[in-house]
């Protein structure tokens, strides 16, 4: 019997992703990464997505107060092996320590664009026009 393939993450992937997110957050909050760029930036980790085999963790981060996110993302990726090593004590239950990759989280920008679009005069006019038809 074959299992149906699904693109949705499993409960285990979600649970492990949340554990990895919490562990990375603690490493960054404690200032264990010695890098001027990382130490000078407040970094928000919104989500960690795990690969199906739990060997790759992709962390989606938003550097706050920085206009060029790519500099912070590059610094995090330079220190990814160090961060992976610091996750060990917090994730002892895992058979393999996942490789950590950092990506820029664009979801906040997408939400902002959608909000601006919904507040635009054209959309407001269309929404008000719908109420007149009823």
From Swiss-Prot:
GO molecular function per UniProt: ribosomal small subunit binding
Membrane-crossing segments per the record: none
Compartment list: Cytoplasm
One GO BP: maturation of SSU-rRNA
Record-linked Pfam families: RBFA
Alphabetized InterPro entries for the sequence: KH_dom-like_a/b, RbfA, RbfA_dom_sf, Ribosome-bd_factorA_CS
KW Transmembrane helix (keyword) present: no
Entry annotated with the keyword Cytoplasm: yes
CC per GO annotation: cytosol
Alphabetic keyword roster: Cytoplasm, Ribosome biogenesis
UniProt record similarity statement: Belongs to the RbfA family.
Subunit structure, interactors included: Monomer. Binds 30S ribosomal subunits, but not 50S ribosomal subunits or 70S ribosomes.
Role summary: One of several proteins that assist in the late maturation steps of the functional core of the 30S ribosomal subunit. Associates with free 30S ribosomal subunits (but not with 30S subunits that are part of 70S ribosomes or polysomes). Required for efficient processing of 16S rRNA. May interact with the 5'-terminal helix region of 16S rRNA.
PANTHER family: RIBOSOME-BINDING FACTOR A, CHLOROPLASTIC-RELATED
NCBIfam families according to UniProt: PRK00521.2-5, rbfA
Protein known as: Ribosome-binding factor A
């Amino acid at each position: 019997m074959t299992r149906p393939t699904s693109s949705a993450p499993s409960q285990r992937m979600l649970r492990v992703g949340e554990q990895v997110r919490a562990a990375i957050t603690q490493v960054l909050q404690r200032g264990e990464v010695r890098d001027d760029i990382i130490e000078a930036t407040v970094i928000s980790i919104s989500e960690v997505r795990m690969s199906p085999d739990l060997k790759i963790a992709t962390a989606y981060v938003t550097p706050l107060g920085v206009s060029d996110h790519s500099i912070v993302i590059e610094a995090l990726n330079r220190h990814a092996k160090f961060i992976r090593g610091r996750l060990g004590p917090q994730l002892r239950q895992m058979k393999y320590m996942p490789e950590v990759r950092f990506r820029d989280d664009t979801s906040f920008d997408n939400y902002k664009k959608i909000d601006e679009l919904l507040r635009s005069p054209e959309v407001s006019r269309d929404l008000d026009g719908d109420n007149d038809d009823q």
